[in-house]
């Protein structure tokens, strides 16, 4: 899949206004990338496929209706800003919160959100220092191991929270490392951008002994 294919895939699924926001996001990202390492340099020529489309696929996998989306370790805004851009027209009541400890990246996130006219919450702090958010959806992309991701997500979950974690082919081994106190069933969904990648979705997950 090339960049043109990715843009076509997106344009079939979102409004013209949303595409305009994503185009602006792409422009801002490539501009800021010259001074801040927002994405891996090797992916700068494939932003639409590797980052924007890869993030956009999570939007349709989330539980509906969702009112609070928490994106952990947002980095350059993936998937958080993409989700917010897609939600603006179709899910205006969705609050997207982006957590990022790097102050410079937070500066980019705030400026991108401002120019894209997105109302998002940006928390510039370490994940472990974030107060409980009671999220309907929690996402994390290219952040940490699955067991660590679940540890990060636990304070913000309810029994109905949907977890969305993109993973590579190591996901099978990672699933085997889940804490014993978790009673979860993972849905393994093939990524639309990479045949060697999946999205792990957990729905209705809860800690043993909790409601």
Curated annotation (Swiss-Prot):
Q: Is Cell membrane found in the keyword set?
A: no
Q: Where in the cell is it found?
A: Cytoplasm
- The enzyme's main class, written as a single word, is transferase
What protein is this chain from? Answer: Ribosomal RNA small subunit methyltransferase G
GO cellular component, alphabetical, reads: cytosol
The main location is cytoplasm
Role summary: Specifically methylates the N7 position of guanine in position 527 of 16S rRNA.
What EC number(s) does its UniProt record assign?
Answer: 2.1.1.170
| Top-level taxonomic group | Bacteria
Its source organism is: Jannaschia sp. (strain CCS1)
The cross-references to HAMAP family, in alphabetical order and at most eight, read:
16SrRNA_methyltr_G
Q: Which family does it belong to?
A: Belongs to the methyltransferase superfamily. RNA methyltransferase RsmG family.
What the entry lists under InterPro entries is as follows: rRNA_ssu_MeTfrase_G, SAM-dependent_MTases_sf
* MF annotations from Gene Ontology: rRNA (guanine-N7-)-methyltransferase activity
Catalyses which reaction? guanosine(527) in 16S rRNA + S-adenosyl-L-methionine = N(7)-methylguanosine(527) in 16S rRNA + S-adenosyl-L-homocysteine
- Listed PANTHER family: S-ADENOSYL-L-METHIONINE-DEPENDENT METHYLTRANSFERASES SUPERFAMILY PROTEIN (PTHR31760:SF0)
Q: Which UniProt keywords apply?
A: Cytoplasm, Methyltransferase, rRNA processing, S-adenosyl-L-methionine, Transferase
> Where do the annotations place S-adenosyl-L-methionine binding?
73, 78, 141
Lineage runs:
Bacteria, Pseudomonadati, Pseudomonadota, Alphaproteobacteria, Rhodobacterales
